[in-house]
């Protein structure tokens, strides 16, 4: 599933780069939702990070996600795949759009415009959904553990 997230993310980015003009807003639902191509030098949703921090943070997050849950069932596998696939999709952008001397410092292609919310892409959405699902699973596991404790 992680591979599917990367493939869809990169395919959409290729299409977006072909049809959208950087910075120009194309409305879908009035001014509330639309397309707007931007190149993001920061982390998810435009959070600014120095270039060397992002790849290191990506690896740390990937390792943490892969180790965070033991036997989680299908939902845990899906959540982990979403986070890993999203992280790899954005990391691919950094590598593909790298500049000489900074092999991981390329720009990430973002294109979903939703009001004043920072622009994002399929990879960002996958990471967000995966993290939320992981948090829900962790909360449910904590509840189960408390329920097993003698009163």
Predicted regions and their residues:
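Alpha-helical transmembrane bundles and membrane-interface segments of multipass inner-membrane proteins
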Residues: 1-151
